[in-house]
Amino acid sequence: MLGQIFPNLTCKGIDSVDETSSAADVSGKVLEICQKKASAVTNNSDFDLVIVSDTMLQDPDVDVLAMGKANDAIEAAAMLHRLSGRRHRVWSATGVCYRGSWEFHLNQAIVEFDDLSDEVLVELVLSNSWVGKAGSYDLAGEMGEYARLVEGDEATV
């Protein structure tokens, strides 16, 4: 998304960040993990601006449970099945560092899934569109046909 605005953007992953959190609720968890990612960025980077983020889904049944990224196709299928035909809240935290000073923002959105048939679930899992995605889906990708944003901004999801 930012690459369209900033053609000379450099995107780098941050390895070995502990993505566990002691926060009680999902919003706190996602913010804490985003802050850990910010701490992992070296202060002497050659960049004018640094952005880190994290996204999690709030379990549709248990508000304090977070749904992150699936580790494999079986977990992805289970997550998509759990979200099928339901609404859920998505939390995103973003940290922006400019001139050595960090500022953090927390946003939420609500997404609703259609009832997903077994065939659609298999198709979504086999497409690998779930890889690296919180809740095992990409609203701007293949899931966009089966889900809609009810509240909030698409950038949050």
Predicted regions and their residues:
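A short beta-strand-loop structural module common to alpha/beta enzyme folds
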Residues: 9-20
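Anionic-ligand binding patches
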Residues: 24-156
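Hydrophobic anchor at the start of a short beta-strand
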Residues: 8-9, 48
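N-terminal beta1-alpha1 ligand-phosphate binding loop
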Residues: 1-7
